[in-house]
Design a protein with these regions (language model features):
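Short acidic (Asp/Glu) patches
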Residues: 98-99, 128-130, 140
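Sequence/structural signature of outer-membrane beta-barrel proteins
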Residues: 37-45, 82-88, 119-132, 161-172, ...
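Internal metal/ion-chelating core segments
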Residues: 154-241
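Cleavable N-terminal export/targeting peptides
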Residues: 1-27
């Protein structure tokens, strides 16, 4: 089946479902994005050897978003095509159309909700979780996310993911590059007057190998820390402090131990900047 027709059919079918029922309590939004850019690369990611030459490339990202919302249910589908100019011929049958986001959320109460599906995540200064919008593909996660958010500024998020490389019948090697086998995280946030405090714990597990004796053995990496921000509209100074500690094991089961301390200070010369 043509992948483009398949995804288009999904969007059209869901749109028909969303439009059923009382219109006054529902909202459907359809929008898109066409983003192109050119890059001149001379030592990008790593120093360029003397025997190699610089490169100039152009890239294109196209997205189609369908968002539905009512008092109890929210949903979003984002189709994405990411390509480099000249990567495929105009008659090529290969395509790069994919599913960037596809999730549904149910509001149990105004404060408590559950979201299931592929979704982009962004927290704090985007150091650990980011949609990576600069990337031509972006980042998203397949997971279940529980949210509890109060009107007083207190927030708690619990996310959990378990990945497989296909529709497997038994535990198999997970060979998706740069991706975890499982992940659980907890994010807490609270506004305290002019201060905003957050805490984050992330536990992700990676298969130690592809053989039968290793696929059931996971190496777990833990990252725990938090952020403290200060901002007062009556003064021109603000800061954002970050602290993280990482421990556990990497995918090759090597021991991990690392620290991060960061402080960002900002002083506004005028209110217009």
């Amino acid at each position: 089946m043509d992948k483009k027709k398949f995804y288009s059919g999904i969007c059209f079918g869901l749109l028909l479902i969303f439009l059923q029922g009382p219109v006054y309590s529902q909202s459907v939004k359809i929008d898109g994005e066409i983003r192109t850019r050119a890059e001149y690369r001379n030592g990008f990611q790593s120093p360029l050897a003397d025997t190699l030459h610089n490169a100039t490339i152009g890239s294109l990202r196209t997205r189609l978003n369908v968002t539905y919302s009512d008092d109890k249910i929210k949903a979003k589908i984002t189709l994405q095509d990411s390509r480099t100019y000249g990567q495929t011929g105009i008659n090529s049958t290969n395509n790069s159309l994919g599913l960037y986001e596809a999730w549904g959320a149910y509001m149990f109460t105004p404060e408590l909700s559950a979201t299931l599906g592929r979704q982009s995540l962004e927290y704090d200064d985007k150091r650990l979780f980011s949609a990576a919008n600069w990337s031509n593909t972006g980042n998203s996660h397949d997971l279940l996310l529980l949210k509890y958010e109060t009107k007083t500024g207190a927030k708690a998020h619990l996310g959990s993911a378990w990945n497989n490389g296909g529709d497997v019948l038994y535990e198999s090697a997970y060979n998706v590059s740069k991706s975890y086998k499982m992940m659980t995280y907890i994010w807490l946030a609270k506004s305290l007057g002019k201060f905003d405090a957050t805490a984050l714990w992330v536990n992700d597990g990676f298969q130690r190998g592809a053989t039968n004796d290793l696929i059931n053995k996971l190496s777990y990496r833990n990252t725990v820390g938090g952020n403290l921000g200060f901002k007062d509209k009556t003064i021109p100074y603000s800061f954002y402090a970050t602290a993280y500690y990482q421990f556990g094991h990497n995918p090759k089961d090597k021991s991990l131990r690392g620290y991060l301390l960061a402080l960002k200070n900002q002083y506004s010369v005028t209110n217009k900047w």
